[in-house]
């Protein structure tokens, strides 16, 4: 419900807020990649691989810092290697309203954030989940799970940039609802009769 009700921001205003040029004629990705506790020693290499593929394909990308889990320093170190790439925008954190609106206008979310599982289906946004984080979680069909592999990453990014494939995957069914749960809850509560039976406890 919060996602649905989040105030919309124009691309022009978003550009000003993050100090990075965005326009409707140019596709951009949002990248958020966290460390997996069981693979924290690989975090640098995994993040470097993701960003290097995006760089080689010259994908305009907004990169957001990871959480503070073990291995986060490796991810941040990898991000710092790309600080001078002109079509990359690196942010340590973003207010929720700006983050949601970046997703609303993005071509794809790439990395392994839970936002790729929960938020993107409602927004009709393709999500590329790289590696084992989030693996086996219940998810909508807009999410593509791939290993941290250069060839597969490049192939999948290319698929997302194909308009025909993009339209096919972006509007898949959303298993998490349409953002109107509060109205449904109110409707159910209104249908419940308030009487003594409701307040009587039964010990089974």
PLM regions: where:
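Nucleotide-activated sugar donor-binding and catalytic core shared by glycosyltransferases
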Residues: 1-204
